[in-house]
């Protein structure tokens, strides 16, 4: 394979894995530990 193809595949895999980790953090098990500032604020 050419170098440009390997670089493009590597960058794509990095972006996909980062997106997957962000979704897991937002909606997976760790999301229970996140605080919600809108629920904490009382009018």
Curated annotation (Swiss-Prot):
Residues annotated as transmembrane: 5-27
Chief location bin: plastid
Membrane topology recorded in Swiss-Prot or TrEMBL: Single-pass membrane protein
UniProt keyword list: Chloroplast, Membrane, Plastid, Thylakoid, Transmembrane, Transmembrane helix
Superkingdom of the organism of origin: Eukaryota
GO terms (BP aspect): photosynthesis
Localization of this protein: Plastid, Chloroplast thylakoid membrane
GO cellular component terms, semicolon-separated: chloroplast thylakoid membrane
Signal peptide, first to last residue: none
Record function comment: May play a role in photosystem I and II biogenesis.
Similarity remark: Belongs to the PsbN family.
HAMAP family in alphabetical order: PSII_PsbN
Protein name: Protein PsbN
Gene this protein is translated from: psbN
